[in-house]
Amino acid sequence: MKRFIFICLLGVFLFGSIQIPLNSQTMDEILKEITQAHGGKAAIENIKDMKITGTIEVPQQELKVSFTQYKKEPDKRRIEMKVMGMVQIQGFDGKTAWELNPQTGKAIEIPGEDAIDIKRGSLALAWILDPKKYGISLVYKGREKIDGKYYLVLEQVYSDGDKSILYIDPETYLTFKIKSKMLDEMMVEVETETYLSDYKSVKGYIMAHKMISYLRGKEYMRIIYKKVKPNTRLRDHLFLMQK
């Protein structure tokens, strides 16, 4: 279960930052508009790293844990959380995804699909400025009405073929909902819906601070960012797999 929680946390961080709606405007016009809506090019590029503290709740299991997440641009990440008295640590150094076994104290490399998900969750914030550079393509699929309001529907496709459906508020250009697929703790592919809200400025950069995910129609996970501290001068060794 813990790896599933880690993957969910990585996913909502990526999608909760910036997404791109398309319409009759040109791509360049859309990129310029969305970039400005999220603080502008300078604000995005000014974020060198982040330290995020918050909580994760899994209502169906009556589980609530605190976490600390470190993100260094362009592609490094480390997540620490305490579950049932044990500290779980997972990281990505730009090349290798790994996790620390709390019982042995040794780090092991994470293989397969989980490693791909972790790498994707460590994507640079600046991908918005040049999606193609990061292997991302976007297709506008029209509009869809949700609770009486129309949202722009965007299909986001990564270079490995993985897809997500994004629902964009046409008034704010912020992500309202994400529909995606992932493997659950039983390694069964499931569809999840994540609602993002409580957007706040972090040194001029706009990102969601509250994410609620639903699995099979029921609330599965609630992630709250309590504090986001940018530009803390994180060192690379923090993200390396311990030998």
Language model: regions and residue ranges:
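Positively charged n-region of N-terminal signal peptides that target proteins for export
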Residues: M1-F4
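Flexible, processing/modification-adjacent segments and terminal tails
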Residues: N23-Q36, A43, T96-D162, L183-V190, ...
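N-terminal mature ectodomain segment of secretory-pathway/periplasmic proteins
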Residues: N23, D28-G105, V139-Y140
